[in-house]
Every structure is written in structure tokens, then in C-alpha cells.
């Protein structure tokens, strides 16, 4: 029996020894070179310098020169081996790092306590999500990529150690310290995420430090304030708390931090923190589990780090088996105590030297044998790269979790039928969540703060009763569920979005039961808010899974998946576009601004259903008083033909109301007795009908007896003092016929041309009469004509019995959520959002803002087949994505795929034109409206005011350029002479050219 027991003991010993292998970082290094450097340093060190290697002091560079002097004194007096920075900016920390490294004879370890990256401690750095969000992500390769990016940023900062990942299994909803610092409640899930992160971090040669051993997840106390206890038995600890650390050790990672926890199942000595426990640090962690990497204490200044009155904290930590003492409260006293303990034999000198050698080995691994100063020039830009921005966004996108979705309520559908409000609890109106919601539809903003009075709460909920759908964002744990919210959820369609730890949603149980949809965003960061809003509208798909259970409501692993149905907002790298090359757009636009080709503009680029570039430049006017924003609404001019009239024509074609060979006179009876009677619709769309390019309808309203001579002149004179266009001067002394024009609205004068400018309703007949009698050119030849689309407008209006603007509003724009895409925007949009066009000195004699610039459209009351449409860039993109999606957007079918293909792919046999769309002139690139790199499949349109859009089905690409180049005068043609729009388009193609791309 004794022999059998001895055999078992030897087997166990063998297994234990086998488990004690080198870490990955140690295995990867050239050991001969490492040992040579370590020996050369160690042999020259005094005892004080050797002891100092085991001390890591906390530093806050933001506190100024006194703190720097204190740190320098520690380096001089106790020879500290490492610095843990707590706060500051990248520039500040880098400068202090360089000073301290220069002051230390032995290179210093620089550490970061950055569980969610540099931004946890350093301002102005990329804000990555917290671990709970990462725990909701299924794709572990993203977590590894994230770890690698944090490692890269650490290297830029001269950081060698990151106290991450947290491998705590968060199984206690009342845990006050871990919460969203944990990856979840399932030990295997936590292990997968933590190990993926560590692989990424150490791939950049940054030492990963898992914490808080033996597991801080199931505590109700915070070790910063007291000593928490965990009373589970060993079997439970092995299967839950210890499991991630076992896998981490088997994975060969370099560091572990021991926490201040009392765990009787591992050490029965009453109230002994794990940090000071030989059974835990030495017997369990090193001997039984075989960990041979660096062992760090949790911060020794924490109140959970308790020892007996006659004991020294740092001595106890070293006696327990730790290697590096992190942030002792009294470093100088502790240094002296450690030195005294060595001299008195309480600490074995050989054992201390072994740990010092281990520290030096890892300093070599971290590159400290070849120490270089941190390069401070361009540091912030090197940290905050486009890739980092993309990755932060991607992690948030993948983590948002949909917990409830009654009858597939989200992504939202039927937008044109819903009046939507957004309520923020615990955050301000117009926060990132609400602003992103407003990009998808018109949304009214409400908010209630933590200290809202009863009267305010009552008022807000009373107003919310008038809405059909309320999207409620919960941004704080300090506002509890109210009876008002419960009642609202019971009567109205309510979507709940939690920007808190999942556990706090249990306080909203009744509202959740009533809500149509519930989602978890885990934190209130700007990116979490932006992507939560996108999920609601289908800008992204729901992919996340709940990493913890919400008692009585949802189990861990819950997550409803949805499809992407609308345009989303993403970083360029999401589609592989080169952000550096996209910056060429900025340079081209800035050139146009400097040349005063236009006062401001908007540029939008979308690919694969994702808006990847969406920028505002300049101002509304050259006075530079109002900046262009994403909310700015522009006069689209002739873009109205393709984004407005053509939509109505395509819908009518879908409904088989006409064929392309149909004669227009079949639908406009007034033309049957004219030479236009045989014009077919195909020729109108191709601009080969023979119709005159334009007609100055306003001349019919001019009182010809009010002036003598000509209205126009090719040169400036006393009678023609005003420049109207390039090479055209006009007089300003004429008057309008009072029977046709009024400066006030009154019976018969309801058609508004401009401010204080109305024409008689009979003027519509005048317009049709002018079209009817206009001179017709040869058919079958290309001649661009605005009149073609006015005729198409009349056709669809006669077919439906509705005005064009109503056809488009109810049939398309409202349903698309394109609320700014509209005619006569002053009826629904604040004037301050509308970008002005021309200071018209001739026809309307006023500065135009919110009134259509085109005279033909103006004299039809702002609604015309050739012009009149206004929009911001985001809403116009929805219309264009509808074309790309073969008639589908937001999960709804607007047009048949067959009709979309016919109109977007057809091309005239005699010109570059498509059916209503313009196209590249492939044979004569100098005459092309597109950039030289645009493929033949591209379709779109330009507008006189300085607008354009181009849709590329081959590359699933949308390009929108909106400006007001006619401000203050249409005579400014520099937009065209500088080729701004086409050069921007070519810059886009260079940025998306896969041959120029780097791997993600």
C-alpha cells in the first residue's frame, strides 16, 4: 500500500513538474542572448537595486512636477523597478516615461491598468468597449484583434505590461466592483474571451496579466474598501472561479495578479487575503497549477490588503510567493522592511534573487535591453489610427444584444405611418442615441434627468401619449422604473434600450414585459448609443448574446438575431476602404473652398449599404456665420429629375400605366393637337425628344409696358446694370403684371414663387401652353431638356390624380424615413437648416432660402418635374440605396427588380444618357459628367446648384456631393472649372481599389 501511495505521489509530482513550463513569451526569446543580458545587469546590481526591481509605484503625471520629483526620488532611494501610471494624456505620460527611464540605471517596467485599453487611464485615446460588451460578441477573432491593437498602442506608449484581462466569472448580480469588467458568468465563455484577448496582447510582446486570482466574481464587497470573502468549496472553485485561470496558465501566458480575497476553502487562516497566502500563491498557483510567469499583487494600498499590526504588507506578499509589489502605500518604509526581512532571514535572499532574475528576463522580453525613448512627435495620431476607430466601432456593433422582439418589431417598418419619440432617462436631449435615431426618421426628443421633479415627469409622459412609437433609452441605474413608463408601454409601441449593466434591467421588469422590443447596449458610450440606434432601424444586424443571466427574465446566451435592412454608419475600414486615401477628398474640397467655388458642402460615400464617409465642410454662405452640418438641407436642382420625378415614373411603369413606346399625348391631352403628340416616353427619358432645353416661363408674367428695350444684354450698361449669368446682364426696372403676380397670398394667388411673391393659379395653364407651342427640334438626337421632365410630371399627375410631391411623399420619402427629401421645405423644415442659394437680382429680387432656385420650378409653386426637390445627404442616400437594392429598402418593396434594372441599366443608342439617369461618357471622357475611374455601369445626375449623385452597381457604391455654388451668384462656375465633383469621385475609387488596400 505504501509503495502504491509513493507511486501516486511520484505521478502527481511528475504531472506538477510537467505543468511547470515556460510561458509563450519566454519560449519565443533567444535564451542565450537573454541570459547574457540578464547576467550582465544582475551581476552589477547592488542589493538595494535588486530589491527595488520588485516594487512598482503608482504615478499620476497629471499632478505636475512635485509628483515627478517624488518618483525620481523613489528611483534614487529605493531603486524601484516599475511604474504604473494612473491618469493623464498620452503626451504627458510619454514625456514622464522618458524622464524616468533616463533617471533609472536599470530600465523600468511601465505598466497600464487598462482593462478596456488606454482610454481607461489616458484621455484622448480610442474608447474601446468594456468587457461585458466584449462578452456578448461571438466572434473571438475580434477579441484577439482587439488585444493586438491594445498591445500595439501600448508599444507606442512605451508600456510593457497591461493588467488585463479580468478573468473573474461574474456570478453575483450584487458584485459592486466587477460588473461590466467581466466577460460574463460562464467560465468557459470567460476563458475563451480572456485567452483571445491575451493572445492578441502578447502577440505585440506586451505582458498580459490576468486578474483577479483566484476569482473576484462572486463577491458582494469591494476589495478597494474592505476584504471580500468567497465561501465556496474547492469543487465549486475548480469548476467556476479557477477554471479560466487554469486555461490561461495552460495557454502559456505571462502574468497573473493576485487579489485581496479571503477564500477559506483555499486557506483556512482567518481573514487572510489571497495576496498574502502561501497556500494560494505558492502551493496552488505555482506548484499545483504550474504557473511560472510573473506574479503581481493587486494594489497594496487597497483596504482589502490587511495584515496583522506587527506585519509588513510587502514582506507578507513576498513571503506568499508574489514577484512584484504593486502600489504599496508607503514604498520607502516597505522597501526598508523587505531589506530588513532579508537580513534577518525572514525572506530568503536566494529566493528574492530568483525573482529578480525572473523580472529581468521579462524586461528583456519586453525589449528593455534595447530601450529607446518614446517618440512623442505624432504620438496621438499613431495611437488613434483609422484601424483603431474601426475596431472600436466593430466591437460595439457586434456586441449590441436584442433580448426581445415581439412579432419581429425591429428592424422598424412602416415608417411613414408612425409618429416617433425618443425618451432618454438619465441623459440629455439630443444625445448620440437620439441623434442617430433621427438620421433614420423624424424623431422628437425628450429626456428626464436623475433629479427630475414630478411635474416635469408628468408633463413629459403626457406629451409622449401623442406619439405612436416611443424609443426609450435608459442611461443610468439611478432612475427606476415608473408607473408612467409601465402604463405607456402597455398602451403604446415601446422599444427599450439599456445603456447600463444588464443586471439593472431587472428593475424594469414590468415595462420589459409590455415592450415590443428590448435591447442591451451594456454601456452609455457614444459608440454604444450610435449602434443601438442603428440596430433599431436595421442599419446593422443584431448579433450579440447576453453574457450574464438577468434573474427571472433572461438566461445567459439569450440573443435574437436580425438582418440588416437599411443603410448603416460605419468606419471606412469596414468595407476595406483606405481612410488615408479618402482624405484626398478633404484636400480637393478645401481647394474648392479656398477658391471660393462654393461656401460649403456635404460629401457622402456609401458602399455595400454602409455610409463610410459623411463629412460637412465650410459654411452656408461666404460670411461664415453658419456651419454646414449633417442636418443641412440643399436645393438639389436637376438631381430632382432622377431622385424625384423618375421615382414616380418608375412606379407608374411598375403599375403598367404606360410603356416606354407610349406617346406622351395619351396622358397629356393638351398635346394631342400639337407637334408633340407623337413624342414617346422613352425619348423624353433619353432626352432625345427634340424639346427645347428650357422655357423662361416667368416672361409671361412680366409687364412689357413697364420698360423699353430688351430685358437682357451681353454687356453691362446703365440700363442693364446687373450680372445675371456669365455673359448676361439684365435690367431691374421692369414690373410684373398685377393680374398674374401678387406680393400677398389671396384668392387665386396661392401659388408661391418666393417670399412675398405669388402667381395666379391660371399660370399653370400658361406653362402648359408655352410647352405646347414651343419649338420642336429633330427627334432622335440628344438635346438635354428640362421640359422633358415637366411633361413626365404632368403624365404621372394625370395618371394618379395626385400632385407630384404627394405621390413621392406618401409613396416613397415618408416610408423611407427621408423626411428632408421634400419639395417646398419651408412647410416642414426649420429655415435655419436650409442652405441658401442665389441672391436673385432679377426674377425674384431676393436672397433665396428654402425657395427653389430654378425659375421654371418656382413658377409652378416649387413642385416641378425638372427641379424643386430639397434634401440632406443622408436622406438622399436612402433613395439611392433603394435603387441599388433593386427596389427594396427597410424590408419593404417599393419597385420591382425588373423595373429597377431596366431604368438603371438602359442606355440611349445615340448618347450617354440612360432612362432618366445620366451616365459616363465612356468614349469621350473629357465630356463625361463622371470621374475617369467610374465604370460604364454608373448612373446618376448633376444639379445646377452644385449637386450630384452617382450610383455604381458594380462596386455597390453611392457618391453624393451637395453644395450651393450659386451663392451668392450663379455666375460662379469655378466648381466646374476646377472639376471638384469628378475629382472627388476619382478619389473615392482610388480609396476603394482593393489593390491599394492593406489587410484589416
Q: Where do the protein language model's features map onto the residues?
A:
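Preference for extracellular/luminal or secreted protein segments
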Residues: 20-57, 61-74, 287, 308-574, ...
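Short, conserved catalytic-motif segment at the N-terminal edge
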Residues: 575-636, 657-659, 768-776, 847, ...
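Short, gly/Ser/Thr-rich active-site loops of penicillin-recognizing serine hydrolases
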Residues: 352-357, 361-369, 444-452, 549, ...
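Bacterial Sec-dependent N-terminal signal peptides
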Residues: 1-23
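Second-shell residues forming the walls of enzyme active-site clefts
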Residues: 46, 83, 95-108, 118-120, ...
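Short active-site loop at a secondary-structure junction
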Residues: 584, 595-602, 624-687, 775-788, ...
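Short, surface-exposed loop or secondary-structure junction motifs
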Residues: 677-936
